[in-house]
Amino acid sequence: MACMEIDPGKEDAEHQHPFEQCGVVVEGKIEMFIGDVRRILEAMDTYFIPAGVLHGWKTFDVPARILDVSAK
């Protein structure tokens, strides 16, 4: 489990893991790319990333804080 604080205007390249991942946006706004689905998430929105699925994210003009859990 990790609490990630991400600065505005950042982007994570598309990647994948051999384990499931999920989390909740604590504050701010972030766009998540999970497989072919793109979602804009704000405070209290949750996400789930199945094992082996390509995913990534980008922030907007405000920072984002997310609580992220990896099921290794």
Q: How should each PLM-predicted stretch be described?
A:
Residues 1, 20, 61:
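Short coil/loop residues immediately preceding or within conserved phosphate-binding loops
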Residues 1-14, 71:
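A short glycine-rich, His/Asp/Glu-containing loop-to-beta-strand
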Residues 5-7, 17-32:
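Short, conserved beta-strand element in jelly-roll/cupin
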Residues 12-17, 58-59:
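Short histidine-centered beta-strand/loop micro-motifs
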Residues 29-31, 38, 54, 63:
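Structural motif
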Residues 36-51:
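Short acidic-glycine-tyrosine-enriched beta hairpin
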Residues 51-72:
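Ligand-binding loop in jelly-roll beta-barrel domains
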